[in-house]
Amino acid sequence: MSLLNPVLLPPKVKAYLSQGERFIKWDDETTVASPVILRVDPKGYYLYWTYQSKEMEFLDITSIRDTRFGKFAKMPKSQKLRDVFNMDFPDNSFLLKTLTVVSGPDMVDLTFHNFVSYKENVGKAWAEDVLALVKHPLTANASRSTFLDKILVKLKMQLNSEGKIPVKNFFQMFPADRKRVEAALSACHLPKGKNDAINPEDFPEPVYKSFLMSLCPRPEIDEIFTSYHAKAKPYMTKEHLTKFINQKQRDSRLNSLLFPPARPDQVQGLIDKYEPSGINAQRGQLSPEGMVWFLCGPENSVLAQDKLLLHHDMTQPLNHYFINSSHNTYLTAGQFSGLSSAEMYRQVLLSGCRCVELDCWKGKPPDEEPIITHGFTMTTDIFFKEAIEAIAESAFKTSPYPIILSFENHVDSPRQQAKMAEYCRTIFGDMLLTEPLEKFPLKPGVPLPSPEDLRGKILIKNKKNQFSGPTSSSKDTGGEAEGSSPPSAPAGEGTVWAGEEGTELEEEEVEEEEEEESGNLDEEEIKKMQSDEGTAGLEVTAYEEMSSLVNYIQPTKFVSFEFSAQKNRSYVISSFTELKAYDLLSKASVQFVDYNKRQMSRIYPKGTRMDSSNYMPQMFWNAGCQMVALNFQTMDLPMQQNMAVFEFNGQSGYLLKHEFMRRPDKQFNPFSVDRIDVVVATTLSITVISGQFLSERSVRTYVEVELFGLPGDPKRRYRTKLSPSTNSINPVWKEEPFVFEKILMPELASLRVAVMEEGNKFLGHRIIPINALNSGYHHLCLHSESNMPLTMPALFIFLEMKDYIPGAWADLTVALANPIKFFSAHDTKSVKLKEAMGGLPEKPFPLASPVASQVNGALAPTSNGSPAARAGAREEAMKEAAEPRTASLEELRELKGVVKLQRRHEKELRELERRGARRWEELLQRGAAQLAELGPPGVGGVGACKLGPGKGSRKKRSLPREESAGAAPGEGPEGVDGRVRELKDRLELELLRQGEEQYECVLKRKEQHVAEQISKMMELAREKQAAELKALKETSENDTKEMKKKLETKRLERIQGMTKVTTDKMAQERLKREINNSHIQEVVQVIKQMTENLERHQEKLEEKQAACLEQIREMEKQFQKEALAEYEARMKGLEAEVKESVRACLRTCFPSEAKDKPERACECPPELCEQDPLIAKADAQESRL
């Protein structure tokens, strides 16, 4: 048990660090070099240096971010300092003596402390050992007693010239309430004047603890103490303390055999350690003050300390881990303006990040050095080489596991890309992975190597060429011009990408998919996508040198989940903006999770986040996305959660996903609101009791408690009331616990506890994964916004975690856990109920004969626990409800939403048909007007035909003539006939084109309508089906409750009847036990049967629901088929319809010709003789032609 045996021990400070070493501290700004003695205090809390004037400067170990030596340390720039250190002499050994300590409150605001030792290689030893203290898990996650001890150590180190502790230092250390500090000093019989001083010998640790108890009394702990100590005695025995530890400080879910409860002899060691009175300790007694320090000790850490260490299996494929990832790593401020810095790569990697981004752009002449910057913005540039050197220096200081360099490559120069590749090879050396591992070839179906396989390696993520043909850009200076496209490989000379055959075909498929997808987007959507993606969509082609460095992380454009599953290439990765990823997650969450089981995805902020703000990473962790990249320079809530979560597992930057999110045979829906298979949900209860030293001012404060997890988790945020007074030293909140009833997947959830000042000013917070929390009373030491531990502020809380149990099963669980206690309580309730109701109605006890035989000493078993009784309970439970039914297809089609949509669609189609008919009529009218202008054969000028009276006729007559429409004066009948035929042909062609366009438009609109209607029906069907499943479960729960009530009534009746049969108390107790045991068996059987019934009904209902959904899909196919058949039929009859319309038009325009010249010799074939003579003649001429 960790309470008795802490997993982690405090860091040990090497003797030479505490003894000190002589250095020269220099500063480039002041050009001052001063001799100092550099030391670390024996407990490893502070790095400090003393000047010759005895002046002392402190650096909290928790504020140190890095230590550097040799060529990576800072170098003096001023000539004055360079002369002091003889740096310009050829045999100078300056690099062997350098030491730089980097500190700061966050990754951007940094201070560099520069030292030079008198001896060689001293700086290296100091850099390594000080950094080891900084990276120790307990440095940032120490117990409350450790942080309080830090205050004492600092007070005793900050002495005046007389070697005493100035009282003013107490006022500076505890500034919230000066009067309370003075009163606490007086209570310890110490001077309290501002100009007074205290002898360090008069202020040992016991006096310091008494001072703290006076300054910050703990009445809330006294209340806990009085509830467990011996009555009327001011101490707690070791037996009482053992009971307290086992009941309150121990996780009730632990197995008693694997994790045995504490014993009194083990607890004695805790009393010896924390009880201030030696006499009490010898007697095995703990005082209230000892209880306070016990609850502040490392044994009561709120964290499960083993979770801080590397405890995950690191031999799984790379895509089975969440990977700490950064976006636009080089930026120190916003995305549009601000400084870029290579130092950010160091700081991000030191924080445990394992994926950094490099936006590479072409360098300018004459040097043509590639640069890193945010393209098309006002951010500054840094050299690519400088960034690579920073990465090489800090790559594996925090974690030995692989680093991924995510290149956004805009360098369109083969020469500069070759230079980039050369820098990577020479600076990274053996750290760079240039070839795939033998066990993990780049083939479909082969998983990625594990973090352990890639330990100490750097992987490149950059576009990879489809073919790697021979290039000479890096060798031939007179070769290819910059900005030109890469040379295409001659047929038969190129090598297929990643050793796969048919890749060219696959790439063509991808391109076709992309073209098809982009073809469906309008201009505004394309612009929006480009603004969301930023410059990521403008990457250039990779040339051979850079392409050859890419292996296991090959980026490609995402097509679809089905396409990725078909290709099954684990080494292919796709990047998504947060908006695109959210869209995919909301539409196909299960497929997204399955995709991440097979290969990797990277999510990055949308391009419109110009202030470098972040999105919440939790939603994408829920989908199993590995690289959820954030802006590390912005310490907002998403970044705070990211830093807190990746602090665990040895700060390795890799967190193994839950088994359910890795197994291909399991499906996981992150939006599930029900139980997740093989995962036990957790109920978390947190009581915020009090706070200590929350602010440097006297203010009112409140606490927020928030849960990050799956969308289906319970209420996410609670808040206490404001503290009753402006007391920030020890406020107490007397409120009910905050309960998160059903945390579906505890491994994915985190708890945030934040303290805010009145006016919503942030004071401190802590974010801890649910599975890293310990149950019991704990002091929660707060952290800053940048996740740095705060020395003073803390909260005292009570945490209780247990397995989630549905309300319907709560009584049964209690009964099974402790049946005697449960039924005793029920008997007490029954007696009280009987007294209140005036006694239960008397009923004959049905089992009198067996009971009598038992009283007389017979051994025949009673029927209470007989199989017959249990069978009766089963039969009662077997009374199945009516066959579960689901909404039919007809009912779904009659739903209001579907009917309303159908009416809208019908209206749209009617309007479309009207527009088509109007266009058709306009064409006929225009054709008729042109024909009318020709007039009868042999007559020129205006025609004799009127198509309609009034405005319509005027409008038609005012239509513009075509040059060929009118007959020339004196033109003969043959000329007019030729022009009639020409106009007729043109009109037919226009009508055919109009008809085809109209029918195609109608078809597309019908297909769209079908898709919308089916989508609506599917949506409503799923809503209905979810409601049906919920109703089925509720009905089952109600039936179970009713059955339990009936069985409870039967149990009470049996007990009542038994008391009338016998007065022998021993026999009554025995029979009562048997009745209770029988009752428990019956309840178990009933619940088991009811559960089976529910599962059976649920299975039947789901089958029916699935069949209904399949009917909807079939209906979609049928509708599409009908629409297509109608389209084909109308297209088939279009030509005849056009000819008929044109003939009707000709008849209308030349009625006189049809009447006056029927006797004229017909030149047409016999089959056309019955037609209008003029039309027949025109048709005949057309057929001859």
From Swiss-Prot:
List UniProt keywords, sorted A-Z: Calcium, Coiled coil, Hydrolase, Lipid degradation, Lipid metabolism, Metal-binding, Phosphoprotein, Transducer
Q: List modified residues, type Phosphoserine.
A: 953
Output compositional bias ranges, type Basic and acidic residues.
Answer: 872-888
- Cofactors named for this entry: Ca(2+)
Q: What is its EC number?
A: 3.1.4.11
Q: Where is the composition biased (Acidic residues)?
A: 501-524
One Pfam family from the record: PI-PLC-Y
- Metal-binding is among the record's keywords: yes
Entries under InterPro entries matching the protein: C2_dom (IPR000008), C2_domain_sf (IPR035892), EF-hand-dom_pair (IPR011992), PI-PLC_fam (IPR001192), PLC-beta (IPR016280), PLC-beta2_cat (IPR028403), PLC-beta_C (IPR014815), PLC-beta_C_sf (IPR042531)
* Role according to the record: The production of the second messenger molecules diacylglycerol (DAG) and inositol 1,4,5-trisphosphate (IP3) is mediated by activated phosphatidylinositol-specific phospholipase C enzymes. In neutrophils, participates in a phospholipase C-activating N-formyl peptide-activated GPCR (G protein-coupled receptor) signaling pathway by promoting RASGRP4 activation by DAG, to promote neutrophil functional responses.
Assembly information from the UniProt record: Interacts with RAC1. Forms a complex composed of at least WDR26, a G-beta:gamma unit, and PLCB2.
Q: What's the protein name?
A: 1-phosphatidylinositol 4,5-bisphosphate phosphodiesterase beta-2
| Native species | Homo sapiens
